[in-house]
Amino acid sequence: MVFPVEAIVGLVTFTFLFYFLWTKKSQKPSKPLPPKIPGGWPVIGHLFYFDDDGDDRPLARKLGDLADKYGPVFTFRLGLPLVLVVSSYEAIKDCFSTNDAIFSNRPAFLYGEYLGYNNAMLFLANYGSYWRKNRKLIIQEVLSASRLEKFKHVRFARIQTSIKNLYTRIDGNSSTINLTDWLEELNFGLIVKMIAGKNYESGKGDEQVERFKKAFKDFMILSMEFVLWDAFPIPLFKWVDFQGHVKAMKRTFKDIDSVFQNWLEEHIKKREKIMEVGTEGNEQDFIDVVLSKMSNEYLGEGYSRDTVIKATVFSLVLDAADTVALHINWGMALLINNQNALKKAQEEIDTKVGKDRWVEESDIKDLVYLQAIVKEVLRLYPPGPLLVPHENVEDCVVSGYHIPKGTRLFANVMKLQRDPKLWSNPDKFNPERFIARDIDFHGQHYEYIPFGSGRRSCPGMTYALQVEHLTMAHLIQGFNYRTPTDEPLDMKEGAGITIRKVNPVKVIITPRLAPELY
C-alpha cells in the first residue's frame, strides 16, 4: 500500500507535536549551534529536502554543495534526529581525534535490527564491551597480517583463475568485455572462498550461494531505503510497517541467514572430526578461525556464539564483495581514460617484475606507481564517501560549535579529499601527487581518510588493500584496453549514499603476455 506524502506528514505531525513540546530543552548552550540549512518543515525537518530535487548525484556531492554555501560545518534534521555534516580538515580532526570516543556510537537504524543480526554486525554495534571484543577478534585473529599472509595463496589462485576466465572471453579484436561484472564475480567468489572455503563461479553449481547473492543485493537496496522508523523511532512505525520494509527485511534476512547457518553447521561438523583425530589448528578459512577462537557463549554479551559468527561473516562479505569491487571498478575506469598513467604503470611492472610471470603480493612493495594509483583512486572515490554515520554520546564542541548529545555525524570524506585548500587540482586524476607526498591510509592524516579514522576506522583495510593492489596489478600487467567507440568512458556517478558508477566499464581488451601465462 502506498501512502501519500501528505498523509504521512499529517500523521507524523500529530504524533510528535506534543513529544517535541515536552522534550524541548530550555537551557541554552554556552557556544553557538552550527548553521542549519533552510527549508526544513516543523517536526519532519528536512526529510524530503533531498528527494525529487532533480539532482541525481550522490548525497556526498549534494552535501558538498551545501558546504560551499553554508560552510564546512552545518546541520539539518531528518525527522527527529539532528544531522551534523563536516568536511574540513579541522572539523574532521575535532570529530575523530578530540571527540573520537564521544562520536564512537552508531545511530539506530531499522535494518540493523532486522538485517544486521540485531546490530551484532561490527559496523552497526554501539561502542562498548561487545564492540571492543568483536573488533579485537577480527583485527587480531581473522584479519591480522599474519592470518592474511597464510591465506595469500588463496587470493593469488582466485585472481589467477579469474584472469584466465577473462582471457577466454576475448574473441578477436572487437569483442566487448563487461569489466564491472567480472570484478563483481571475482570479489564475491574470492570472499566466499576465504570465508567458507567454497569454490563459487557464477551460473555453475551452488544454488545456495546464488540465492545468497540475490539476497545480498536485496540487502544493499533495503539498507539504503528511507524507513519512517529511522526518522521517528517509535514502535508505531515498526508495528504497522506502512512501507512494507519490515516484511521485506525479514524475508531477505531469512535467505541470508539460511546460507550462513548451513556454512556454520558444515564447519562445526568438520571441526568435530578434526578434533577427534587431533589435528586442530589447521584453519582453512575464516569460519574455521572464528570457531577456533570463540567460546560457546559470546562472553555474556547477549548474543550466542553462532549469531556472532554469522554477523561477523556477513560484515566481511559486505566489505569485501561490494566496496572492494566498487573501488577497483573506478580505478580501472580512471586508468582506461588516462592511458598515459596506464602505460606508466605497465612499464613499472615490466621493469620490476617482467613479462614472464605474474605479479605476486611480494612485488607490490616495489611497485611505487601502482601504490600511488590506488591511493589516488581512494582519494577521488572513497568507498564510504560519508563514512558510516556516527552518533555522539554526550554534548561536545566541533569547530567552536555546540553539538548536542544524540547528533548523527556525516563526515563528508569525498568533499574533504577534493578540498582545493588541501589538494592541488583536486578533481584531476594525478597519481604522481602521492609519489612526492608521504601519506598513508591509517587515518592520522586528517586530509585523507578513505577508510575512516579513530576507533571506528575500517578493520578490513589491510585485506581490501591487498586485494585491490593485486587485482589491479594483474589487470594492468595482463591486458591493454580501449573503449568500443575510442571515446573516454562515461564517469557519471549514481545517486545515493555510496558512489557507484552508473554505467558499467565495457572495454575491448588485448593480452600483453605470452598465451601460456593465461
UniProtKB/Swiss-Prot annotation:
Q: What is the similarity comment for this entry?
A: Belongs to the cytochrome P450 family. CYP82E2 subfamily.
Where does the record place it? Membrane
The pathway noted for it is: Alkaloid biosynthesis; nicotine biosynthesis
Tissues/organs with expression: Expressed in leaves.
Give cofactor(s), names only.
heme
Q: Could you identify this protein by its name?
A: Nicotine N-demethylase CYP82E3
**Cross-link Glycyl lysine isopeptide (Lys-Gly) (interchain with G-Cter in ubiquitin): which residues?**
K254
Q: Which residues bind heme?
A: C458
Q: Name one GO biological process term.
A: alkaloid metabolic process
Molecular functions per Gene Ontology: heme binding; iron ion binding; monooxygenase activity; oxidoreductase activity, acting on paired donors, with incorporation or reduction of molecular oxygen
Q: What class of enzyme is it?
A: oxidoreductase
Primary role:
Involved in the biosynthesis of pyridine alkaloid natural products, leading mainly to the production of anabasine, anatabine, nicotine and nornicotine, effective deterrents against herbivores with antiparasitic and pesticide properties (neurotoxins); nornicotine serves as the precursor in the synthesis of the carcinogen compound N'-nitrosonornicotine (NNN). Catalyzes the demethylation of nicotine to form nornicotine.
Q: Which reaction does it catalyse?
A: (S)-nicotine + reduced [NADPH--hemoprotein reductase] + O2 = (S)-nornicotine + formaldehyde + oxidized [NADPH--hemoprotein reductase] + H2O + H(+)
Q: Which residues cross the membrane?
A: 2-22
Give a yes or no for keyword Transferase in this entry.
no
Cellular component terms, GO, for this chain's entry? membrane
State the Pfam families in the record.
p450
